Regions:
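C-terminal soluble interaction/assembly domains
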Residues: 62-65, 74-174
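A small/polar active-site loop signature that marks catalytic segments
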Residues: 1-110
Length: 174
């Protein structure tokens, strides 16, 4: 049936690295949610039928499997959705550092690092850490909600060592 169909239109997606960069640099969390849904769509296509499981749940299960493979226990990272804005999304600083350390060892590590906001240069960190050793050195994702402020990413030490870090402030009032 589809062999005889006419294509009425086509929309091509930007490359994954551009989607990731748009999501991370400016904290466009809907882009990041859509990446989780894309993973979930692929996972559901590969899964045996098991009743109704949403695309989001398939994506969360895939992410949970990756975290377990890295050695992050379920109690250290609870994923409720892909934006990080839900109160059901919980992660310890240690879990984030373990994930960042794992990602730093992957072939796409440099692409990911460049997709993160850079202190004093661009994205959500453009106005932060200027005229400090962190400027143009810290590559990190920001995250904030009422009374919650987080920063997780990479920094290069004065000795040239690349470090993963996560800073989380809860019940923080400016």
């Amino acid at each position: 049936l589809l062999r005889h169909a006419d294509v009425l239109g086509e929309v091509l997606s930007p490359p994954l690295w551009q989607i990731l960069q748009r999501g991370l640099k400016r904290s466009q969390n809907l882009y990041l949610q859509n990446l989780l849904l894309s993973v979930g769509a692929q996972a559901s296509a590969d899964a045996a039928p098991a009743g109704f499981i949403s695309t989001q749940d398939h994506g969360i299960k895939a992410l949970d499997r990756l975290l377990a493979q890295i050695g992050i226990p379920p109690s250290a990272a609870l994923i409720g959705e892909g934006t990080g804005l839900s109160r059901r999304d919980l992660a310890t600083p240690d879990a984030l550092v373990r994930l960042l350390t794992y990602l730093a060892a992957q072939p796409y590590a440099q692409t990911l690092r460049q997709a993160l906001p850079i202190a004093g240069v661009d994205g959500t960190l453009i106005g932060h850490m200027r005229r400090t050793a962190a400027e143009n050195n810290v590559h990190a994702k920001t995250g904030s909600m009422t009374y919650v402020h987080c920063l997780a990413g990479y920094v290069t030490s004065a000795a040239g060592e690349r470090l993963a870090f996560a800073i989380m402030l809860n019940n923080y009032q400016r």
